[in-house]
Amino acid sequence: MHPRRPEGFDGLGYRGGGREEPCPGVRPFGGGAEMGHWVTTPPDIPGSRNLHWGEKTPPYGAGTPLGAAGLNEEPGLGAGGPGAEQLNRFAGFGIGLASLFTENVLAHPCIVLRRQCQVNYHARNYHLTPFTIVNIMYSINKTQGPRALWKGMGSTFIVQGITLGTEGIISEFTPLPRELSHKWNLKQIGGHLLLKGLTHVIAMPFYSASLIETVQSEIIRDNPGILDCVKEGIGRVVGMGVPHSKRLLPLMVLIFPTALHGVLHYVISSIVQKLVLLFLKRENSHSLPTESSTSVQSMLDAYFPELIASFAASLCADVMLYPLETVLHRLHIQGTRTIIDNTDLGYEVLPINTQYEGMRDCINTIKREEGMLGFYKGFGAVVVQYTLHVAVLQLTKIIYSTLLQNVS
């Protein structure tokens, strides 16, 4: 239940040291150069503004040091004319937008099928490869229409917003650090991870409601309102709202697996992103661009290492925690009287009637009745999701490279 995108932007730097006094000759905030700087700052990645074990990722490519630019000049803007300057100013926005669009919109059908396969204990076809996933996507789209693959997308955005807002509020009114400085210690790390765990626990009822909207079959489900996720989440807490069966697990039973999954996903993705950024930084330092391609290459070196690191971090965390996510989703969905699509056929519906007593019982039952591969049901959807993400990133890189070369 982690947000798939960054919690913030390192470029703002609002949690650094004391407020710096403006130097003489520097224009106040709001000028053209400053606005250009905010636009071209590389998009951050999950955890990068929280776990600063080394230096922060340089906002500009290795081939264009910050000190080489004048007070009123944008770093990384070569002498390519106003066209190249304009493209550079909006390059970060465009590239980051493409990545956000892929993760939250284009990949949503993969998330829908992935979750339906995870909670479908009836399934004989585990959909471990992308080929069977694409086939079942086609079948569901043919019988139920395109809406069946995009259901619950609005609620996923709401859960992300609740998660980010909760984290910000807790960090403001408690000593738990939302970010870690360069000189961190074990106490700060413990408080920081505690903040992450509390955030996921508070957002847990809304995550359950969003999960139900995502896996509920389009055949029998009514058109939900955009705030139904919030209403159902509050109803789950106070014990009101849609009636559930006696097999519904209390929220206290869900706290540990929910917090464990959220914290582990954050830690794994943060470590992987740091390692990938360190590797890419060393690679870029050994291959400096030529003068003719400095503007183009410096722009690409500024933005794409961040996106590649974010991609690798999310992929590794999703793959490593996939079995735990399967258990988590089955516990959340139990007792909610949810009807899902038949992921074997694509044109029937199935009820969810599990009777797990808790996390340990769920793990033992899956292992006994479905085998070890039962924890990886729907894994082919992950392959499709990240393959699509790679394709969009590569296409975006080609488009920006072509545009910048044409105007330079």
Swiss-Prot record:
Keywords: Membrane, Mitochondrion, Mitochondrion outer membrane, Repeat, Transmembrane, Transmembrane helix, Transport. It is found in: Mitochondrion outer membrane. Residues 66-76 have a biased composition (Low complexity). GO terms for cellular component: mitochondrial outer membrane. Residues 1-23, 52-80 are annotated as: Disordered. GO terms for molecular function: protein-containing complex binding. The keyword Secreted does not apply. Solcar repeats lie at residues 86-177, 301-403. Its main location: mitochondrion. Transmembrane protein of the mitochondrial outer membrane that controls mitochondrial organization. May regulate the assembly of the MICOS (mitochondrial contact site and cristae organizing system) complex which is essential to the biogenesis and dynamics of mitochondrial cristae, the inwards folds of the inner mitochondrial membrane. Through its interaction with the EMC (endoplasmic reticulum membrane protein complex), could regulate mitochondrial lipid homeostasis and thereby mitochondrial fission. This is Mitochondrial outer membrane protein SLC25A46. It comes from Gallus gallus. The gene is SLC25A46.
